[in-house]
């Protein structure tokens, strides 16, 4: 065999070794990626199989929120008078958060005919100009429950989406605990005892999200 043939044979063997080594390294990289890949599934409620579960979180925290609201709730008559006398001072005394505080309230009232699960309440001892409404679902608006205690902060969550989902999940947890047993069609004309919260958007218009409803 000539020197040229020997050299060509050696170069060919080196190329084959390099190709084999490249193939082995590529397989190792692909295997590593596969091992490090996690499949995340979502269900209809938007919960993740891994990571933050809004509804699980809410089931755990709603009892704490409820207890905080019930402990701090002020009678509607006292609150209405305080807001009428000095709204800023009343908000600072009874509310949580700013510039639109969430205020806990307790009241007894007669349910008036409503629409879409929102019922006006006739409450004795408050100004006639005060509009009090109770939202009972099935659709519940707002993040008043999330913000009611002052202990649930944005920094507790990874991002804004989790923070928003936590608020919606608290509404669902309350609905399951408090509202599922209500016969909405039978509410008008009934007297109810309510403990709940509302965001102070307008001192003369309270939309209450309940943590407790007792029909008498």
How should each PLM-predicted stretch be described?
Residues 2-216:
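OB-fold and OB-like single-stranded nucleic-acid-recognition modules
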């Amino acid at each position: 065999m000539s020197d040229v043939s020997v050299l060509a044979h050696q170069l060919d063997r080196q190329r084959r070794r390099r190709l084999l080594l490249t193939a082995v390294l590529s397989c190792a990289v692909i295997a590593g990626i596969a091992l490090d890949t996690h499949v995340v599934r979502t269900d209809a409620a938007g919960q993740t199989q891994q990571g933050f579960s809004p509804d699980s979180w809410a089931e755990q925290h709603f009892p704490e929120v409820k207890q905080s609201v019930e402990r701090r709730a002020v009678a509607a008559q006292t609150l209405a008078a305080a807001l009428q006398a000095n709204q800023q001072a009343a908000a600072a005394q009874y509310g949580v958060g700013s510039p639109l505080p969430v205020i806990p309230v307790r009241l007894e009232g007669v349910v008036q005919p409503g629409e879409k699960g929102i019922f006006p309440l006739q409450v004795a001892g408050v100004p006639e100009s005060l509009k009090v409404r109770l939202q009972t679902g099935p659709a519940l608006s707002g993040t008043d429950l999330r913000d009611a205690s002052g202990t649930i902060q944005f920094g507790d969550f990874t991002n804004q989406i989790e923070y928003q989902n936590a608020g919606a999940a608290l509404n669902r947890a309350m609905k399951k605990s408090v509202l599922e047993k209500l016969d909405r069609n039978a509410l008008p004309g009934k007297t109810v005892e309510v403990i709940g919260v509302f965001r102070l958007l307008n001192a003369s218009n309270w939309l209450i999200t309940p943590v407790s409803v007792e029909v008498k």
